[in-house]
Amino acid sequence: MDKTSAYQGLFFGALYTLAVGLKHAPILMIESAKQNAWHSYILGVVIVIPALWLMHRLMKKHQDKNIYELLSDSSPIAGRIIILLFSLYFLLINAHDIRFFINLINILFLPRTPMAVLGGVIIFVAICIAREGKETLTRMAQIFLFPFGILVLFLPFTLATQIELQNLTPVFEGLIPYLQSGYYAFGTMGELIILPLLFSNRSVPLKYTIFAILLGALLLAVMLFSSISVFGPNLTSTFFDPAYMVIRQIRITDFLDRSDLIIAAFWIPVIMVKIAGSLYIVVYGLSFLHSKIDPKAMYTPTGMFSVVCGFWFFLNTNQLIDFNRIKPIINVVISLLLPLLIYLIIKSKALFGAKAKH
């Protein structure tokens, strides 16, 4: 029985979109829509919600089963192929996030530490978290997202003296750039397809799934609003990490001029929970491919393979950023087309089953 509460699922979903979504995708969004990038997350939300609604409609008849379980029951062969595609997708996401996290820690905090050592420490912690199961993951998300989310929401107030509202004008300057920015936002918001794969409709209903994507989009928009209003769109788009740069601007007192370290201390557990969540969904998916696969034995090799893929697929920072250019295309397949295919498979199976009974 899934013991995850709806609120825990909500926090996990918001955390999953926020953890890395506030880093690289905003650079491409600002390059496209300039000062209007911060509210183009609305488009990403609008695109993803129909797919999530479709998944929850399928689960409505079987309240205690998630999409993976429904696929495994309704169509063993096609279901396994689709589950494998989802597993490969989240493996790619995890490889990107691990490589990005290693780069960030290496550049900002530990420049003399070998990247292989950083990768080993990160994945060791992620494996320990993932092995405890999704109940532990969602509880950690609830614990760590709350303080970090509060800090993000109060960010515009702490930067009030540095905000220049003229950096946000003119509003809605050009439809095509705005649509392009929303396209990059979809690259982040589409990751929320993880919720119906992990949680049943009884534990995390559609209402809370939508709240999760809205909360994640709100926090991302506030962070991007702060960056653009302080630095302006042209300068912000040149930063490797706009979120970190705007946090560096916070000066609470003369004695607390490195509050970025405090905020980083709250963000690091957030991204660790996301990495562990991606590792968990990959191993969880693999357990459906063959009955003899032991999930407990798969976390370590899958985690180490994720680190290797991170170094293999992404050789430098530019490739990490460029991945966000093609990620929305991947999300069209994974977050839009696959849910539609799943709906057709399960509905057709139910239809033919009903005819066979008659």
From Swiss-Prot:
The keyword Membrane applies. Pfam families: Spore_permease. The keyword RNA-binding does not apply. GO terms for cellular component: plasma membrane. Keywords: Cell membrane, Germination, Membrane, Transmembrane, Transmembrane helix, Transport. InterPro entries: Spore_GerAB. The chain crosses the membrane at residues 10-30, 36-56, 81-101, 107-127, 143-163, 179-199, 210-230, 262-282, 297-317, 326-346. Coiled coil: none annotated. It is a multi-pass membrane protein. It is found in: Cell membrane. Its main location: membrane. One of its GO terms (biological process) is spore germination. Belongs to the amino acid-polyamine-organocation (APC) superfamily. Spore germination protein (SGP) (TC 2.A.3.9) family. May be involved in spore germination. This is Putative spore germination protein YfkT. It comes from Bacillus subtilis (strain 168).
